Swiss-Prot record:
Transmembrane segments: none annotated. Residues 281-293 have a biased composition (Acidic residues). The keyword Signal applies. This is Ezy-1 protein. It comes from the Eukaryota. Keywords: Signal. The gene is Ezy-1. Disulfide bonds: none annotated. Residues 167-189, 273-310, 414-456 are annotated as: Disordered. Residues 418-428 have a biased composition (Basic and acidic residues). Residues 1-28 form the signal peptide. It comes from Chlamydomonas reinhardtii.
Amino acid sequence: MQLSSSLRSARSAAASSGCALASRPVVACRRVTPSVTRPGPFTIATGPLLPASRSKAGGGIRVFSSALYEFGQQLKEDLEHDLSRARVDAITNKTRIAELEQQRRILMAVGGMADDEPELKAALMQLEEILGVSFNELQLMLAETLADHPAKMDNLAAMAAVVGTGSDGGGDESGDRRTADAADADGDGDGGERAWLRFKADVRACLADLRNRKGGITLHRAIVKDMVSASSNPGARRSSSSVDKMAREELDRLMPFLLDDFLDNMPGLKAAFTGKAEPGAEGDDGEDEEEGEAQGVGEDAVDSSSGGSGGGGVLSCTAWQQVLGRTVPASSPTLALVLARGYLAMAPRQYRALALVRMILPGKTGGGVDGALTRKEGLSLLKKLRPGISGLADKDKQWLEWVIARLAAEFAVQPAGDGHEPEPKRPELPPTAVQREPPAEEQHKPTAGARDSPNM
């Protein structure tokens, strides 16, 4: 009895302790008796063993190959050798060019053939000083080539105008243009008056081309502001804010009126073309001085035999430099380049060449403003110079300018064709082919059956 009672008390104590353990949270049980898990089976990692920068195909992993190394070294040596030879050839060519230029100077000095046209480098320095533009070596070399071929240079300028404006380069058919053409056809009026009308028409055409360009409306609006502030006509007075609010159509209507007033009132500008003193000069001494200066220009102000801007002729270098000197200081910075483009067509060949080079090779200034070609327009010019050219989309700007310069130089020096498109080159014979000339008697008297001979 005593044994059974002790067993029952032990069971009750165990049951009570079991209930207490069962009522505890699972976490407490795990703390008391943590479970031991067995490790899983061995697996191979599927992720990259190398960092992301080196896990790509061939990234940072180099396999040494003696044949590949020798080939790379040989290719590097060949490229360095070709580059050195190209530099030597360039130095040789520049030396030869300097010698030929010196011989030409001596020949012109001895033969009395010197004229008033400056060398191209002197014209370049003048444009850089007055207009604030700059030229690199590539532009200078192309301008020198174009200046020696004025006819082909004008053809190239017409091609560039077509791709730049999308038109035939006719510009604005203003009343001045029609008056100048009529005077040329009838033979009326002197060369100075025709040159003055031609100049005004060319400036109008340049402003019309500027309006059609991307971003040209901003420069167009700035030019209108400058001419409004400089105008002495009360009817042309406009505030700067009112010009900012003008639409394109209103600017187009206001521009011709302002331009005529601006050009007519510019001191000494018309006299540089016509060679006649302007009425209303202040003081007798000033009038005599102005008249003498104008007469000095008017003696040879227009050289109609030099080509250029049509019947109006090309201004002599002295007259054109006076136009340049009088126009730029009196105009605004934005209008200066536009006016310069207007009479660059009437300028001597050196200035026309520099203007054309600035148009087709804009350099760091980009394109789309002041007549400079954009990249898309440059590609169009390349296709005109070389119709079969391809693979130009992925080329950079510097490569594009080099190709344009080379093809433009080739276009200038090649024989005259149709005046607009370069003549196709004759196919070159393969290196193994040998071209033989038949005897003189065979050239004039072919033998019988020669057409059927397999050797002919």
